[in-house]
Each structure stands twice: as structure tokens, then as C-alpha cells.
Amino acid sequence: QNHLGHYLMPFKKKDNNLYKFNLHSIGDNSKGHSLLISPTGSGKTTLMLAIDAFSQQYGGRRYFFDRNLGMKNYVDTLKGHYFIINPNHATRINPIPKYDTRGNRFFLYEFIKSLIFATDELIDEVDSEEIKNAIDGVYSLDINNRNLSNLVTFFSYNWKYLNRFNIWLKSSDGLLSWVFDNNEDEFDLTNNIIGIDFTHILNNKKALLPLMQLLFFRIE
């Protein structure tokens, strides 16, 4: 057994006896971290999904960070939500939180910073006020008009960092505008089974970092 109840799943040993597999020790309430390492095509994904299938006896939510659509059929079979982050098959994402709350404003402030500034780049009070004013402005709009292309109109026209935002904007035909500049938001993580395919942006840190920031904010 483990602290969740019944053992996770059965394996047959070489002597044909039963091996009761767990990711936890008895009485251990810590997370059952595991690492699977083996050559390509050896069955890592199959084993992981088998473990997940058995773990559903305990309930809870699961999030699959996927590559090359490896888990899509599994997520679809269990009636989960599977998102593909790809400009040719884009899940429309609007990162601006729907409700104007203190917590949502704090997230949006940090998120906008991540779109404009490098992680080790310091900003001064003037730059901070530019972001705060833009957040005030976008929340003054009707909820259907809250997107990045409209948010940028609340920055000062001569702000020295304004041009850095263009890459994210459809209004500027930005290279990464497909990622976040949308009126709609289809990035709904309320299903108990979520799969997200990151194949297209795994090597694009400029897009990947803010996407992960948004993802973990919504999970929490």
C-alpha cells in the first residue's frame, strides 16, 4: 500500500509472482517523483501512460507536457483537453485574466515584463509605471476588447521600449503574434486531464518562457 490507498499497479516478475508497484513508500506523503531514461522507441511513453491510467484510481488532475503529439491519443481517449501550440494549428491564447483582481494584475504585470525585458534586465520606476498604466487601460475596456494589440495603445508613444512589444502584436504583424495576441481564449485548463504539445516552440525561449509562466499561473 501507499498513503493514497491501494498499490498503484501490478507487474509480473520473472518468476511469475506479483510485484506491487508504487511511486511512494508506505507512510511517505511526499510527491512520487520518477525519472524514466531509455533509448528512443523503447516504451517510455507507453509505460508512463500505463502508470497514469492506473493512478486514476486516486483521482486528481494530470498535466502532460508533450512533444510530437506522443500523448494526444491517450488524452483524447480519456476525454481530456489537448492543446497544440503551433502557428498552423494554434490554440488561441489570451493571457489577460478575465477578472480585474489584485492577484490577476500582479500576474499580468510580471507577464508583460517577461514579454519586453530579459530575465536579468532591471527596469526603473518609469518603465514600471508604463506597464501599470497599460494594465489600467486594458481593464477599462470592454472584456471582448482586452488583447495585447489594444493594451499596447496605453503605452506612451515615445516609450523607449515600445518597439520590443511589436513582435507579439498582430497589429504590427509580429513574428510571435499568433501566440498571445487573441481576443478569444481557448487555453482552458479546468479539465482533469490536460495535454499540451510544445514541439514547435521548445527551442524558442522567447515564446516558451512566458507561455510556461502563464501555464503555471493558471494551474495554481
What are these regions (language model features)?
Residues G41:
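Walker A (P-loop) phosphate-binding loop of P-loop NTPases
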Residues K31:
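Short coil/loop residues immediately preceding or within conserved phosphate-binding loops
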Residues Q1-Y19, S25, L69-K72, D76-E220:
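P-loop NTPase motor domains
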Residues K44:
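Conserved lysine of the Walker
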Residues L47:
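Hydrophobic positions on the alpha1 helix immediately C-terminal to the Walker A/P-loop
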Residues L36:
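Hydrophobic anchor at the beta1->P-loop junction of P-loop NTPases
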Residues A53-Y63, L78-H81:
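Post-Walker A helix-loop "phosphate-sensing" segment adjacent to the P-loop in P-loop NTPases
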